[in-house]
Amino acid sequence: MIVFPKSTLVGKPVPKTAFYRNLEVNAKMKQRFVDSVESITWTAKLAPSTLSVADGKTVHEIAVFRIELKGETVPTDVLVFIDRKMPRHTLFLLQHDDDFCLLVNYKEWHDAANTRFDIVKTFQTGWTSADKLSLSLDGQDMDAVYSAIVKQVAGADITSEAKDLHTAVAQTKEQEALRQKIAALEAKIAKERQPKKKFELHQQLVKLKENNE
């Protein structure tokens, strides 16, 4: 199991209602959350005061929540909705029976006033046993600590080689969108019966694949 520095530990149970009572959550999403989540614990507070690192330009605190799930299905859409409204960066440690995984919604501030977040992309590790789950809190400031966490959780899901996290995630999303376009176009070509139209679609496919190289 991941061992957070003693100075960061909170270990405070959080009522499930605390996650959505002040949010505009529709009844269906609220029920999904209730049906999926067994319990929530505020595990750790990662901040300059608890990690002895400098404050970040965009990241000031990372709240670590341990969420015990009732089943293997992760309610990602619910966690994204709630996380978008939370005024801090977060890391979720998910548990189902004896299996664990990490989930982070990579966030960026929506505006210069830092009034709310945009969830750019969600990353999740695979399920594993507690003794095999690891995480290093590396960095001289909170921005670097958060960047290191996201990169560790994302692993090979970040396909860009850019060192800057913002750029790497943005390029990864572009690459994913391009691969989806290629797959959709290949499926369309397979169904097309008119030779001329099939040729035109194939030419489009060649250009898309060139951009994907």
Give the ranges of each region predicted by the language model:
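Extended assembly-interface/linker segments at domain junctions
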Residues: 75-161
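N-terminal, leucine/charged-rich tether regions that mediate assembly and partner docking
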Residues: 1-97
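Generic signature of intrinsically disordered, low-complexity segments enriched in small/polar residues
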Residues: 7, 22-23, 36, 68, ...
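Alpha-helical oligomerization segments
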Residues: 162, 168-213
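Short, flexible coil/linker segments at or flanking structured domains
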Residues: 7-8, 21, 30, 80, ...
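Detector for Asparagine
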Residues: 22, 26, 105, 114, ...
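N-terminal/domain-start segments enriched in small and hydrophobic, helix-friendly residues
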Residues: 1-8, 14, 115-117, 121-123, ...
